[in-house]
Amino acid sequence: MNKFAIVLAAGKGTRMKSALPKVLHQVAGKSMLAHVLTSVSEVEIAKNVVIVGHEADRVIATLPKGTQFVKQVEQLGTGHAVRIAADLLANEDGATLVIAGDTPLITGQTLEALFDYHFAQNATATILTAIAPNPTGYGRIIRDENGSVEKIVEQKDANDFEKSITEINTGTYIFDNKSLFKALNEITTDNAQGEYYLTDVIEIFKKAGQTVAAHILDDFDESLGVNDRVALSQAELTMRKRINHQHMVNGVTLIDPATTYIDSEVTIGEETVIEANVTIKGNTFIGKNVLITNGSRIENSEIHSNCEVRNSTVEESRMSVGSNVGPYAHLRPGTVLSEEVHVGNFVEIKGSTLGKGTKAGHLTYIGNATVGEKVNFGAGTITANFDGKNKFNTEIDDFAFIGSNSTIIAPLHIGKNALTAAGSVVTEDVPDEAVEIGRGKQVNKLGRAKKMPHYRGQ
């Protein structure tokens, strides 16, 4: 049987108190809507429709290529939101999943199990329910004396007895598709909110003698719908625990999982060790046998096997096998370290490529440079690459030796096996195997110190 999906992503999210549409707030580095769409994609769906409304264009811009969407111009309730997908789905034979775009913790496995249960029960509608420790705010599942689902009552419409019920509606359903759109034409706004409730179709199905089933979630956390920043932080915490657990199961050592923040799209190889207070964000790849020490931050980068990142920041950069950085180094966007490169204390590199075996041990800035193999940068070296308007490139060939406190005024080229003397200001190209000296000659004025303000006598 064909499977379809409708993802509800039209709400404003007033309680978030944000200019950003609610479904675009991020959990573990990915929007809540993207998490939901990922889970839906794990089920074999013939057609997926996203309902957009508030800030529709911003939401549409984030959708995967080819995703179908419908704009809900007026937000008149969940029933209305589903009904406007009629032109795309109403005539289809099959079962339709309806899910909210602010439920980032729900998994593809749960959705697959929900479809299986729906088909096994030969149901017209199947509700994904959960037993809530505190059901306040959720719609309650009302069952009859035989335990069958009778209806769903929203919090604002519930009486005291109904409010005491702990089985709640998670807001995720599967419906027989044609029955769903037929019932949606019968619902009204006669309720406390004055909206078209999707849940009202359940009572319509029951009155028609159709089967309404309920599948209870094993993990209540999956049911979390995010309506404010408090719930967002709860979703972040739960997702982070889930991500960290999976990495540890896969052979990664996390010294302190409670202070380790790993985004959902990060890949990490076996035998890698990650110490406390580490953040790894975005689309980052980390290979095998990597050491990442306390306080490091890595974002949208590739760190290949046998590398070390010691208390450093790596952004949009690539570290090849056996390279190491830190402590207190900063690889800025566009940096590429070849194999066995060493970047040490308080070194900053931006938009540069360093060849195999090159070393910049301390207190160095390298920007917009192409550096060959086994080049050595002395402490205090900088490439002066910016004139206030334009950035300029520096080229340094294999085996060059850059003396401490050299200032390299780009654009220029330093040749193979060339050497710059300590303290030089390099303003011209340096040929292969040349020694460059670009500093004033030292002169000692004997006895002159006695006339200087600092002098304290014998």
Swiss-Prot record:
One of its GO terms (cellular component) is membrane. Its EC number is 2.7.7.23, 2.3.1.157. Keywords: Acyltransferase, Cell shape, Cell wall biogenesis/degradation, Cytoplasm, Magnesium, Metal-binding, Multifunctional enzyme, Nucleotidyltransferase, Peptidoglycan synthesis, Repeat, Transferase. Acetyl-CoA binds at A379, S404, A422, R439. Gene3D superfamilies: Hexapeptide repeat proteins (2.160.10.10), Spore Coat Polysaccharide Biosynthesis Protein SpsA, Chain A (3.90.550.10). Homotrimer. In the N-terminal section; belongs to the N-acetylglucosamine-1-phosphate uridyltransferase family. This is Bifunctional protein GlmU. It comes from Lactococcus lactis subsp. lactis (strain IL1403) (Streptococcus lactis). The lineage of its organism: Bacteria, Bacillati, Bacillota, Bacilli, Lactobacillales.
